Amino acid sequence: MATETYKADGFDDAIVGIDMTTMPFRLIYERSKMIAILMEQDDMTEEDAIDFLAYNTWYDHGDGYPRFVELMDKEQAFEELDHFYEALGGTGDID
């Protein structure tokens, strides 16, 4: 079991919380803030920033590595779930 919590270097301003359901705990980053950071610091377009982060950062490296979330209100969350399940051919019923 890993005993370290890792961070995404250069993205401290995008930290929005801690996942305390795993050991070790994981930092939680807001994806849209990470995109904005790259756009400002590296003069990237939004599309380039998303591509870079998707390829280099937004996947699970294992225990202790960060989680990446998109913050939204409940209506947006339910709508996103509906779209996701619809794309998979399901009904998207949420209990």
Task: Give names to the regions the model predicted.
Residues 1-94:
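C-terminal alpha-helical interaction appendages
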